[in-house]
Amino acid sequence: MRLWEKALGSQIALYPNLNAEDAEWRKLMRDVRFRRALSLGINRHEVNEVVYFGLGRESSNTILQRSALFRPEFRAAWTKFDVKAANALLDSIGLTRRDAAGLRLLPDGRPMELVIDTSGESTEETDVLELIRDSWRQLGIAMFSRPSQREVFRKRVFSGKSMMSVWSGLSNGIPTPDMSPGELAPTTQEQLQWPMWGQYYEQNRKGGEAPTSPDVVELVKLFEEWRNSGSADEREKIWLRMLTINANEVYTIGIVTRALQPVVVRDNLRNVPVEGIYSWDPGAYFGMYHPDTFWIDTAGRR
């Protein structure tokens, strides 16, 4: 058996829904202080040790070190477990009132009970969310997970019924400047952190909602500049600017990256790399290793 490194930006990531239907929660999700507080309130070391046996690496949802675009500050942004700093950020928003159980209260008086939607397909997600639930309780936030079928899950997110959801991180964690940075800007409804803004772009302003955040508007502009760019240097600068904005604004909350994928190889199967990248985009999993060149060694067998 071989252990190949996955190329996801984060094995599991949280997606605050900036287009949530609930006005109070939508306002919070669009406040960078709230997103940063949630990120600081996650004990990633605990998650890595308990769920991934210490084999992963604590990280935001960003590109991996194998990419020439990687910068250490992207990985480290708002990832240090710091309950004091997280609580200070929540206080600065004005969320200072608490109920008898110690839960913070929303401006309308409701307790801060944050429901995270899942597709119900992964016990790994459930285990990670249980650990996050414990650390967020120290922030005065009660977190609950709501599993459902994938189709229902997506409809809830796209319609704004979901406050937050969980999925894997960036699908391409090892990009080059010539690969599309579309995952970093609202370009499709499929993006769980801003489905209505993505739909607006995807449907050429005929559906969804126009982005209101200046940084998000800049991301869309940068993506268009990348599409029209004829210079490799310019494309690299655009990529780095988009990565910087995403790291600072914490539109998605990464947890652990560099998780390992077991690859079972028959003893007499030859030409399979001992070390590899397990990734759909780029790579098509085994595709980039040319499986047509794998062969079975039958020497000495009858």
Task: Please state what every model-predicted region is.
Residues 145-155:
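Short helix-initiation/N-cap motifs at beta->coil->alpha
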Residues 132-142:
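Short alpha-helix C-terminal cap/hinge motif
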Residues 32, 80-87, 91-115:
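Immediate post-signal peptide segment of exported/extracytoplasmic ligand-binding proteins
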Residues 25-30, 70:
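Primarily short, surface-exposed interaction patches in extracytoplasmic proteins
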Residues 4-17, 37-78, 84-88, 124-134, ...:
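Detector for C-terminal structural segments
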Residues 21-26, 142-145, 224-228:
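Short, well-ordered beta-strand elements within core beta-sheets of diverse protein domains
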Residues 111-120, 143-146:
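Short, well-ordered beta-strand elements
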